[in-house]
Design a protein with these regions (language model features):
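A short C-terminal boundary segment appended to hydrolase-like catalytic domains
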Residues: 107, 112, 120-127, 158-188
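Beta-strand-turn-beta hairpins that frame and shape the catalytic cleft
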Residues: 1-5, 74-83, 125-131, 152-161
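Conserved beta-sheet core of the metallophosphoesterase superfamily
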Residues: 53-54, 93-158
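N-terminal active-site segment of His-dependent metallophosphoesterases
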Residues: 1-50, 67-71, 145-146, 175-188
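Helix-adjacent hinge/juxtasegments
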Residues: 53-109
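Active-site environment of divalent metal-dependent phosphoester hydrolases
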Residues: 11-15, 38-43, 59-64, 90-95, ...
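Active-site neighborhood of phospho(di)ester-bond hydrolases with catalytic His/Asp-centered motifs
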Residues: 6-9, 31-37, 53-58, 83-86, ...
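A short, polar/proline- and glycine-enriched secondary-structure boundary/capping micro-motif
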Residues: 16, 93-98, 143, 169-178
Length: 188
């Protein structure tokens, strides 16, 4: 089983990032995924020894417009195909070669889609894909939403997702999915 922390929209909130890192102690997190806004905020996670996977956000314009940095990524974890994107749909800052999130979702190319941008945490299923927005870690521009991040526990046939709320580090949303008969993914 692999345990992954997912965060988004940190917007240079160093105190929220420190709070997040203190919550990671003892959780046996192997990887941290940062979904952008702000790309450079994630460096401190790498410095603390986490294996970092990241994509830039739309406020990371110098990175988002750099063709050497992938705005969207497809990774595999325990045989689950996971699509990483800052926005849940195409954005006017996208590069021509960027995959369009809505097309990836419509054609069921992935099992899980991780995105941020809206600051609104949630776990949903659409068109056979589990959609996860970890929310945000930005005390200044929360848009009325609490500070949240996600923990994914993934094994070959099961996905457990928890949206954790700070500063209490309490579970706000919890859902479990499994691979059903054939290729389907169903909520347990």
């Amino acid at each position: 089983m692999k345990r992954i922390a997912v965060l988004s929209d940190t917007h240079e909130d160093d105190l929220a990032i420190e709070l997040f890192m203190s919550c990671m102690e003892g959780l046996n997190i192997q990887d941290v995924i940062h979904l952008g806004d702000y790309f450079d905020d994630a460096r401190v996670l790498e410095e603390r020894g986490f294996r970092l996977i990241q994509v830039p956000g739309t406020w990371d314009e110098s990175y988002y417009r750099d063709s050497n940095i992938q705005n969207r990524k497809l990774i595999k974890v325990e045989n689950w195909k996971i699509f990483l994107t800052h926005t849940p749909e195409s954005h006017y800052n996208d590069l021509r070669e960027d995959p369009k999130p809505e097309e990836v979702l419509e054609t069921s190319q992935v099992d899980i889609m991780l995105f941020g941008h809206t600051h609104l945490a949630g776990i949903h299923r659409r068109n056979g894909t589990v959609l996860i927005n970890p929310g945000h870690l930005n005390s200044y521009e929360g848009r009325g939403c609490p500070l949240t991040y996600a923990i994914l526990e993934i094994d070959k046939n099961r996905l457990n997702v928890e949206i954790m709320q700070l500063p209490e580090n309490e579970v706000r949303i919890r859902k479990t999915f499994r691979r059903g008969p054939g290729k389907g993914i169903e909520e347990v």
